[in-house]
Amino acid sequence: MFAHKLNVSVISPEKILYKGEVDSLVVPGSEGFFGILPNHAPLVATLGIGVLEIRKGEKLKNISVEGGFIEVKDNTVSILTDHGALKEDIDIEAEKKALAEVEKLSPSDSKNLLLQKTKTRILVASR
């Protein structure tokens, strides 16, 4: 029998960011974005830095994620992120100030990583 929903849990070390039934996900994988629909094949993958999109009906919820893992099995999706943030938890003005400070740094891999993380949080907060 085919299911029409996914049971999703998004967990960071700090808290449970989301738990519930959803229609679909768009996930920032370490090698690019991918979609998850009900009855997806079993999957384990690593997460990159980006916006996790959770769709339930006409509603879209965005969560900033910074690395971690996803497991999909039997319409249950477990997402464990190294760090995640909900829109309501992000101080957009503080993130914009942090972005200005990061942009002053000399070019490096760590600067690029900080830029990506900060821009992702700003994107989630502004949606």
UniProtKB/Swiss-Prot annotation:
Q: Which family does it belong to?
A: Belongs to the ATPase epsilon chain family.
Where does it reside? Cell inner membrane
Q: Which InterPro entries match?
A: ATP_synth_F1_dsu/esu (IPR001469), ATP_synth_F1_dsu/esu_N (IPR020546), ATPsynth_dsu/esu_N (IPR036771)
Q: Which organism is it from?
A: Leptospira borgpetersenii serovar Hardjo-bovis (strain JB197)
NCBIfam families in the cross-refs: ATP_synt_epsi, PRK13444.1
Function, please? Produces ATP from ADP in the presence of a proton gradient across the membrane.
- On whether Ion transport is a keyword of this UniProt record, the answer is yes
Coiled-coil portions: none
**Keyword Transport recorded:** yes
Protein name stated in the entry: ATP synthase epsilon chain
